[in-house]
Amino acid sequence: MHRKFATAIGVGAGALLALSACSSSSSTTSTAPATSAAASASATASASAAATASSGGASSIVGSSSFNDAALQQLTTKIQGAIGSKSLSGVKIAFVTNGNSAYWNEAKAGWNAAMKWLSGKGASGTFQEPTASEASVQVSLLETDSAQGYTGWGVSAVTASSLTTPIAQAVAKGLSVVAYDSPLPGTAAQLYIGTPNTTAGCDAGKAMTQAIGSGEVVAISGSWTAANTQQRVAGFEQCAGSGIKVVQKINDNQDVATAVSDLQASLQANSSIKGIYAVYSYDGGAAGQAVTSANDIGKVTIVSDDGEQNTINDVKSGVIAASILQRPYYQGFMTAYVLAADKALGDSATMALVKPYFVAGPGNTLSTGVGIMTKANESDFASFWSGIGISAQ
């Protein structure tokens, strides 16, 4: 489900088509773009059409674009009300990614939208994208930010274990820490803001089952030690059923070229492969390229995670059957609000506001929801991205 790094593939395996996005009005207040009635109607129609489609094949996968936007906007309103007329001049917060990737553009849009309201009340914040996806870089940033008077720190950990002690030390000094994108259970992080990864993996498993029924599947990810990968694949295997067997787990070490070549080798070595579950954000495009070069379009079904441009292109062309999407916008948006509230209101008051919105999951999970992009409902996602000024995740 993850995003990440390395080189871009250039173009998707399918034809590069221009995204058709509906225009949406922007607001001067710190709110997320509202889902239009047309988009909602389109999502309903897409789901209805898919539900009535004949069993088997990509057309049988039911898409969804609802996420958890309404609940998170309700929570935002409550936080704003609780802050009220309080000054946020003592708030200094950071959003630290796990590397430099186009995936974070959507999260940055959400962070910036939240900071418009928060900075108007005196808060300051920085969006920090390390050029290297290394645990040591994140540890160094945490130590530096803590020493420079930051009051709150949001992080997508490269390696959870490497941050356990540094987070504990920072929290002991008064820093608030929130995990997003990948949970940090067992650490001093207060909560996790993001997709319930097991649920997202379950949706991927269901989609694969709807498309192929049964058969051998390859799973590929950039890291098999990352909590989000482990949870996604566990959810996939739980919900795919006994008829689908993951026969190979490929580690591409967050390198696109490696992902493509390893998948090509896997397809060449095993003609029985019927599906690929592509976990990291670039893996969908890599899988599309591998399947296309093997002339296996229609024979090998791809279910991917996230919505990088290459993935979108391949969903639109039918090379990828479905992609399971997160809502990075709200990872950035809610991280800013929760960290600011924790400083302004205190931990107990902030958690009292947030706790009713937790869902089942590790580390106090504030869910940003799960979306399922198919060829039938891709325009719903394009409309949202257009409204926040980007073309893809």
Give the positions of each predicted feature.
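Flexible loop/hinge segments that line or gate small-molecule binding clefts
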Residues: 152, 161-199, 308-316, 320-321
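Hydrophobic alpha-helical
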Residues: 155-172, 236, 253-314
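Hinge/beta->alpha junction and helix N-cap segments in small-molecule ligand-binding domains
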Residues: 67-75, 96-110, 126-138, 158-160, ...
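Sec-dependent bacterial lipoprotein signal peptides
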Residues: 1-20
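Bacterial lipoprotein signal-peptidase II cleavage site
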Residues: 5, 19-32
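Short, well-structured alpha-helical segments in soluble
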Residues: 135-150, 259-272
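An alpha-beta-alpha
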Residues: 93, 97-101, 111, 202-249, ...
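Hinge/cleft segment of the Venus flytrap/periplasmic-binding protein
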Residues: 41-89, 240, 338-393
